[in-house]
């Protein structure tokens, strides 16, 4: 079978490798407009079925030798016992203890968090550069005005999906700030602070006090616009916990959010299928969602919790906060 994949992000790259492994002919098209960050968070410290997607993603990264680096994480705030038990069932070693450098009790987790070097995954995928257009009535895809012939078209273009398919999702802008701190521990730990409302992740993991801080806040906007942000809104809260922080650089990118801020997949027509709504945690759930789409194509298997038709009665919605991590 021949597939055309529209979008070479985490989803498109994962689908490419999965379908090629099954022996299919696959062409990936990409406009090249999106920024590809070198590394992103992969965490198992999620909730409910998202943990299963994250486990599937982790298996994919290992199978296809995507580089990763594991870190200890510290979660601050009250976390329900049912969630803690689900983390342990996923293979994470957790324990509550006093963390001197944070001056607070926290849940210390080992085996749950890592940086995954998604740029290596994405750069491994050959692609044809150009702007795609989808004609749903004719079930055709055009690249710069020229029809692309395939048996199935998989549209996984992230924040451009609402424009291409009119799916019930929205484009939004999310951002985080690179900071310098006197706390060297920030450079080799993840911190999820649900009391102050921020997260922190290492930049490189060298223990130099250089980290990336954000809070999952979003601004709804079509992709490609220049969006001004107030970085001190999150940094002031982070300083209450971490002390002095010097902002070095703030960067962001456009993402795609669904009405419930969880991933979605399913058919738009018989030949045009969709996956998306990664909601800022695509490195965690992206390859897992790609696997669900492949399973649906091959066998018709559906996981209703993530299936696109759950939004069939949604008429209007507002994007929520990104799930970092629960």
Q: Each predicted region: which residue ranges?
A:
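A conserved short coil-to-beta-strand element within the FAD-binding core of flavoproteins
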Residues: 129-144
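C-terminal catalytic lobe of FAD-dependent flavoproteins
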Residues: 245-326
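Short hydrophobic core segments
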Residues: 4-6, 148-160, 290
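Dinucleotide-binding Rossmann-like beta1-alpha1 core, especially the glycine-rich loop
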Residues: 38-105
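Short beta-strand to alpha-helix junction loop
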Residues: 52-53, 79-80, 107-124, 225-230, ...
């Amino acid at each position: 079978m021949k597939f055309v994949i529209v979008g070479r992000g985490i989803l498109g790259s994962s689908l490419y490798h999965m379908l090629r492994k099954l022996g299919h002919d696959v062409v990936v098209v990409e406009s090249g407009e999106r920024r590809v960050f070198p590394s992103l968070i992969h965490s198992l410290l999620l909730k409910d079925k998202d943990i299963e997607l994250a486990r599937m993603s982790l298996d994919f990264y290992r199978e296809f030798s995507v580089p990763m680096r594991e870190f200890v994480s510290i979660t601050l705030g009250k976390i329900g016992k049912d969630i803690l038990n689900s983390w342990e069932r996923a293979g994470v070693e957790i324990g509550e203890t006093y963390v001197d450098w944070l001056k607070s009790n926290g849940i210390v987790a080992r085996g749950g968090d890592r940086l995954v070097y998604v740029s290596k995954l994405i750069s491994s995928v050959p692609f044809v550069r150009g702007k795609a257009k989808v004609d749903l009535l004719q079930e055709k895809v055009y690249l710069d005005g020229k029809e692309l012939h395939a048996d199935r078209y998989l549209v996984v273009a992230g924040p451009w999906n609402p424009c291409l398919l009119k799916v019930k999702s929205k484009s939004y802008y999310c951002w985080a700030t690179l900071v310098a701190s006197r706390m060297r521990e920030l450079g080799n730990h993840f911190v999820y602070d649900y009391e102050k409302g921020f997260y922190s992740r290492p930049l490189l993991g060298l223990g130099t006090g250089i980290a990336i801080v954000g809070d999952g806040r979003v601004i709804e906007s079509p992709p490609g616009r220049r969006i001004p942000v107030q970085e001190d809104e999150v940094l002031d809260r982070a300083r209450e916990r971490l002390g002095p922080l010097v902002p070095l650089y703030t960067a962001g990118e456009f993402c795609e959010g669904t009405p419930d801020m969880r991933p979605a997949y399913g058919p738009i027509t018989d030949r045009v299928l969709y996956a998306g709504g990664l909601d800022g945690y695509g490195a965690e759930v992206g390859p897992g969602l790609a696997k669900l789409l492949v399973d649906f194509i091959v066998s018709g298997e559906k996981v209703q919790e993530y299936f696109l038709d759950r939004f069939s009665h949604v008429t209007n919605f507002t994007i929520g906060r990104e799930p970092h991590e629960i």
